[in-house]
């Protein structure tokens, strides 16, 4: 299917919401006739605020989760997975209700007792890389080689916001992110950069502006992210 169906014959038990973050609300609205209070909604869009954005819109139960995957849209309804990278991270609260399903489907997964920390661990990297590749118009490996100090500075800004939000990422999280970046191909793109180049909708608000708003709430300066967002918005 290329859009949400409103003709389901019964209420759905579990819904994996695999849209872009800016499409999630519309997708959820399209499913409204198929949801009940017992339905489990699992959004896996990039970002750390999916649950807080979606829960007020439905009586179904929304849970935070994230996915590690490298893929891109071929056409509506067809997504190509580009590498073997795949891992679904879910909250421990969903283990009993979802593990049998995930094992049967052959999906690599793990359950976490601190899902917010898992979200921010992924977000630290994808936010920094997504915004910097888009700002400079170069791949991830090139960002690391040409703008090493700025990349490290941006990672530190995001790390600081996470701490202010009560998310205690490991002390070496930035070092690990830099190490990952150092191993990436020079021309490796990010989905945010690709979407902005196409002039389509993008996750800029989720990956960049969200951090600026949170920084202001906590009185934190984010000059690098502010500069990038002002150019890209």
Model regions and ranges:
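A general structural signal for well-ordered alpha-helical segments in protein cores
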Residues: 12, 24, 50-51, 95-99, ...
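NAD(P)-dependent Rossmann-like dehydrogenase/reductase catalytic/cofactor-binding core
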Residues: 103, 152-233
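Glycine-rich beta-alpha junction loops
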Residues: 46-48, 66-71, 94, 115-119, ...
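Short, flexible turn/loop "capping" segments at secondary-structure junctions
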Residues: 9, 80-83, 185
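Rossmann-like NAD(P)(H) cofactor-binding subdomain of soluble oxidoreductases
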Residues: 1-78
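Residue-level detector of family-conserved "landmark" positions at structurally sensitive sites
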Residues: 40, 65, 112, 172, ...
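Internal alpha-helical scaffold of NAD(P)-dependent oxidoreductase catalytic cores
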Residues: 34, 53, 57-61, 76-172
């Amino acid at each position: 299917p290329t859009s949400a169906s409103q003709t389901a014959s019964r209420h759905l038990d579990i819904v994996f919401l695999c849209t872009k973050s800016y499409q999630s609300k519309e997708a959820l609205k399209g499913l409204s006739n198929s949801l009940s209070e017992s339905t489990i909604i699992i959004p896996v869009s990039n970002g750390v605020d999916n649950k807080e954005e979606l829960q007020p819109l439905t009586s179904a139960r929304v849970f935070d989760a994230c996915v590690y995957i490298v893929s891109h849209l071929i056409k509506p309804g067809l997504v190509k997975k580009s590498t073997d990278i795949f891992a679904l991270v879910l909250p421990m609260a969903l283990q009993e209700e979802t593990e049998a399903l995930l094992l049967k489907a052959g999906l690599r997964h793990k359950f976490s007792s601190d899902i917010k920390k898992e979200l921010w661990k992924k977000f630290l990297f994808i936010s920094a890389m997504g915004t910097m590749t888009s700002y400079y118009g170069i791949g991830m490996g090139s960002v690391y080689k040409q703008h090493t100090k700025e990349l490290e500075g941006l990672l530190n800004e995001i790390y600081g916001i996470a701490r202010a939000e009560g998310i205690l990422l490991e002390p070496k999280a930035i070092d690990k992110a830099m190490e990952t970046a150092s191993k990436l191909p020079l021309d490796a793109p990010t989905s945010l950069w690709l979407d902005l180049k196409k002039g389509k909708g993008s996750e800029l608000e989720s990956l960049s502006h969200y951090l600026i708003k949170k920084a202001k709430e906590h009185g934190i300066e984010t000059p690098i992210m502010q500069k990038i967002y002002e150019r890209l918005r």
